[in-house]
Amino acid sequence: MGKIIGIDLGTTNSCVYVMEGKDPKCITNPEGGRTTPSVVAFTDKERLVGDIAKRQAVTNPERTVFAVKRLMGRRGDAPEVGRWKEHSPYRIVAGANGDAAVEVQGRPYSAPEISAMILGKLKADAEAYLGETVTEAVITVPAYFNDAQRQATKDAGRIAGLDVKRIINEPTAASLAYGFDRKANEKIAVFDLGGGTFDISILEVGDNVVEVRATNGDTFLGGEDFDQRIISYLVDEFRRENGGIDLARDRMALQRLKEAAEKAKKDLSTSMETEVNLPFITADQTGPKHLMMKLSRAKLEKLVEDLVERTVEPCRKALADAGLTAAQIDEVVLVGGMTRMPLVQKRVSEFFGKEPNRSVNPDEVVAMGAAIQGGILAGDVKDVLLLDVTPLSLGIETLGGVFTRLIERNTTIPTRKSQTFTTAADNQPSVSIHVLQGERPMASDNMTLGRFELTGIPPAMRGVPQIEVSFDIDANGIVNVAAKDLGTGKEQSIRITASSGLSEDEIQRLVKEAEAHADDDKKKQELIEARNQADGLIYGTEKSIRDLGDKLDAALKADIETKVTALRGLLESEDVDAIKKASDELAQASHKLAEQLYKQQAQAGGPEAGAQPEGDAGARKQDDDVVDADYTEVKK
């Protein structure tokens, strides 16, 4: 059995860990980073993922996709998607199934498909680190993700070639890492403010048991919103100072502003003031325009004060659901890059009445916990019990459009709950089961997870048939619903997948595309390596020819130069085999060149001809003419 990796699939950055023995270990990417930007870019020739995609975003804004996690499991017409469209330099559309998708070069990509590209890179990085194929993973999601968003994440894993052994809530993963090997019993609050989402979870940790008491949050609140406030401020100030020029209409300028806003936000976590300096940001008939502006921490805090305040109400609700007060919380653990912001830390301290615990790395602790969960599933980590909860209530629509709950929010999972219903009309031949998730009293105000029909009900007066509806939530938080006519024993069930999400056929098609792309990547890597090797061989050979000058045999020189010309002509070709063959031929000819070089050195004599390694043996010849000197030690 191979390793089960732990992946934190983040809005802004992603991270991957693995258990090595009893210790979780961070897997660095080839660029040397411990986290990888959750960015995918498309160029005319290739697809880029991670740091390399982020670096070219300014020059390629419309084809560089970031923060796609915000679109996972959402409909194209959802209000949150509409808000994101206003600020996004890339094009967001409704896919064929109605879900939010990204359109690049005329082709729509679903959110799970883009996420799969990020997961595919993390998988490849893990394989390079471990030296073995990786097929299994534990992937984290925000605790307040609904069923559609969880299913979309699982689909992304499948497309990337990963068997997702468990979907685990991010605060739960963080608490697992925090509580790993801790014996003391503690009530902790995990305050998780990341790039795109906010979660608060109340847990009991100790003696290798992690039990979630309650969770709450906002799946559309995070660092991207803070960045946007800075961008809007910079755009407004620039417009005011430059005769109404609107940078928001220039996608390339907008991308530069985004990078500057992110940097300024980070700088102001450690300094009181920073300067935003973007020369040649745009131009008009009078010439180029430059953006130079100072931004203070006080100004930033004023811009984002309401965003920070939005984290408070979920904290209150989570504490109430857990039946605890802020004073009963032993530790507040900060997770997510945004918790580095002093204003966030100050508000957390004020609400909970204590300084937050900063002992964990907010960027990595979630992936670390996912790896520990992978170790538990693989049997490598023993005696650790994890008890998670479902974040939202589940139920069905009943007469009058009422939402009838079967499973209350913060119920420990996995769980199963049944309830008996009846018909609303005489001789009703079927019932429609409308499955919903949410907290509002009316069905229309909650999120539809799915619908299915139970048919073949025998004619009877209303109120007579007995229809048992059962909800089953697995450890991933994914829902199965069944309806059974207790009179006939007839049963109908549905496994809830992402609402209007990817069908099985679509997933299989995307899996095949991802595999084909992986093969293409491998071939591309082979081509790059062959070209680099050939280029190095050409350089070395030409240098040797120059060094030998007219001492080189004319016929041999002509033969080698012919082979160099032939190989150089192949450097831009896509034929790996031809490049390798020409490289081998040049290498063989170069061996003769080396032989001639050594022969000439031997004939010439001198230090090069009989040179020995440095040290005693090589130093003796020179020492023959050295006179030993007498000396007297002078005592002080």
Swiss-Prot record:
Region (Disordered), start-end ranges: 597-636
CDD domains, sorted: ASKHA_NBD_HSP70_DnaK-like
InterPro entries named among the record's database cross-references: ATPase_NBD, Chaperone_DnaK, Heat_shock_70_CS, HSP70_C_sf, HSP70_peptide-bd_sf, Hsp_70_fam
Matches recorded under Pfam families: HSP70 (PF00012)
Residues with Phosphothreonine modification: T197
Keyword Nucleotide-binding: yes
Bias kind Low complexity: ranges: 600-616
Keyword Repeat in record: no
Family membership noted in the UniProt record: Belongs to the heat shock protein 70 family.
Described purpose of this protein according to its UniProt entry: Acts as a chaperone.
Protein name as catalogued: Chaperone protein DnaK
